Amino acid sequence: MVATTETTNIGKITQIIGPVVDAEFPSGKMPRIYNALRVEGKNAAGQDVAVTCEVQQLLGDNQVRAVSMSSTDGLVRGMEITDTGAPINVPVGKATLGRIFNILGEPVDNQGPVYTAETSPIHRAAPKFTDLDTKPTVFETGIKVIDLLTPYRRGGKIGLFGGAGVGKTVIMMELINNIAINHGGVSVFGGVGERTREGNDLYNEMIESKVINADNLNESKIALVYGQMNEPPGARMRVGLSALTMAEYFRDVNKQDVLLFIDNIFRFVQAGSEVSALLGRMPSAVGYQPTLGTDVGDLQERITSTKEGSITSIQAVYVPADDLTDPAPATTFAHLDGTTVLSRGLASKGIYPAVDPLDSTSTMLQAGIVGEDHYNTARAVQSTLQRYKELQDIIAILGLDELSEEDRLIVDRARKVERFLSQPFFVAEVFTGAPGKYVSLEDTIKGFKMILSGELDDLPEQAFYLVGDIQEAKAKAEKLKQD
């Protein structure tokens, strides 16, 4: 969706190299940087062509260089190109919920047009320092392992690390569900350079788990914006901004707490690198664009809390060749407030969510922010699990009987803690048959303190598996006893 000015400014295409389009405009009527240019007409075969480009460079001699947001197939030199007089605009507001959009804000889900008068440009300045909410506030998710060990910051940015099949999508959907029910918030998902199949699977899973209400889209809790792997680099580079623009409207105008998911932030950087090379810029370290820090900063600095509302962002991060010093993840890490690492080992044990309690980190886990009680409980849980991890080699070689009484007690409690970190999800009800549970932070801390203090040493460890709060674990133990 592109805005147009009343006085039409028309130029002519002079050169096309892949997704890069050069155009000449009349003297004194040059388009601004980031303006959307529109090409509409017929190609040599008589088929309709409609392409939107974004101005990236003013070359001199009345020439501009733009990057196309879709395929340039069918474009020829001499075709008319119109300056819309404004950046790319996308629809915003309640009408976007339950729908899938492309980079231009056009619906691509065969559900008909989007009826909204509200649109916003994808290029905007980050909020002013004076408008920011700088008080560190914990964002309660209702997921025990996250709230206790890697608390999310309201308006913070969290990196989600995990391979295929360990539960990234399910955690994302549960967060979307919980924020909608318990915070009155909404979510926006930006699929940046993701596989078309994955995007389709996510959409269908969200319909199945009622995150998207196919019968009444107004009751949906999420808007989806996709720029898939087969799209030109311009679209993949800008789709994150389109998703962010929709999220900003919910924060600034509707004054809501918003969850913004970006999958994958590495592909955003990769697309920027491709565009940079196409524009003839000298590559920087490892072939990345020289503007890497600026590109990432422009996106990340707009994701923040203001006095009106917050955007809390969960970003999937791919690490090339597991090299954390690669410029792409290294630049991203500088902006993150926490990391949630998913473990295949835990997933293989059937412990879901498979969040690694020892590898995951958060800047919020400080006594001065979360309080002494929360901090001490979290550290005690981690030290118990760490000791259990150290003892596993001895157990594997010599057996449990060779451990001291104290170590046996640690192993017993650690196994209970490990199982109590699991939790039934609302969005997984249709698959597991177990009703989902939202656990408050207060109940989470209370439960783990009781396990570590030894109050529940007489309960079997099965009682702690896939339950909500500690009262439910006690009830399950009673039921197991009767059976």
Swiss-Prot record:
MF terms (GO), sorted A to Z: ATP binding; ATP hydrolysis activity; proton-transporting ATP synthase activity, rotational mechanism
Gene Ontology cellular component annotations, sorted alphabetically: plasma membrane-derived thylakoid membrane; proton-transporting ATP synthase complex
Broad enzyme group: translocase
Disulfide bonds: none
Location(s), subcellular: Cellular thylakoid membrane
Main localization of the protein described in the UniProt heading: membrane
CDD domains documented for this protein: ATP-synt_F1_beta_C, ATP-synt_F1_beta_N, F1-ATPase_beta_CD
UniProt KW keywords: ATP synthesis, ATP-binding, CF(1), Hydrogen ion transport, Ion transport, Membrane, Nucleotide-binding, Thylakoid, Translocase, Transport
SUPFAM superfamilies according to UniProt: C-terminal domain of alpha and beta subunits of F1 ATP synthase, N-terminal domain of alpha and beta subunits of F1 ATP synthase, P-loop containing nucleoside triphosphate hydrolases
EC code(s) of this entry: 7.1.2.2
UniProt-annotated binding residues for ATP: G162, G163, A164, G165, V166, G167, K168, T169
InterPro entries: AAA+_ATPase (IPR003593), ATP-synt_VA_C (IPR055190), ATP_synth_F1_bsu (IPR005722), ATPase_a/bsu_AS (IPR020003), ATPase_alpha/beta_chains (IPR050053), ATPase_F1/V1/A1_a/bsu_N (IPR004100), ATPase_F1/V1/A1_a/bsu_N_sf (IPR036121), ATPase_F1/V1/A1_a/bsu_nucl-bd (IPR000194)
Topology within the bilayer: Peripheral membrane protein
Catalytic reaction equation(s): ATP + H2O + 4 H(+)(in) = ADP + phosphate + 5 H(+)(out)
Subunit-structure text: F-type ATPases have 2 components, CF(1) - the catalytic core - and CF(0) - the membrane proton channel. CF(1) has five subunits: alpha(3), beta(3), gamma(1), delta(1), epsilon(1). CF(0) has four main subunits: a(1), b(1), b'(1) and c(9-12).
PANTHER family xref list: ATP SYNTHASE (PTHR15184), ATP SYNTHASE SUBUNIT BETA, MITOCHONDRIAL (PTHR15184:SF71)
Family: Belongs to the ATPase alpha/beta chains family.
Function as written in the Swiss-Prot or TrEMBL entry: Produces ATP from ADP in the presence of a proton gradient across the membrane. The catalytic sites are hosted primarily by the beta subunits.
Annotated protein name in UniProt: ATP synthase subunit beta
Organism: Prochloron didemni
Gene: atpD
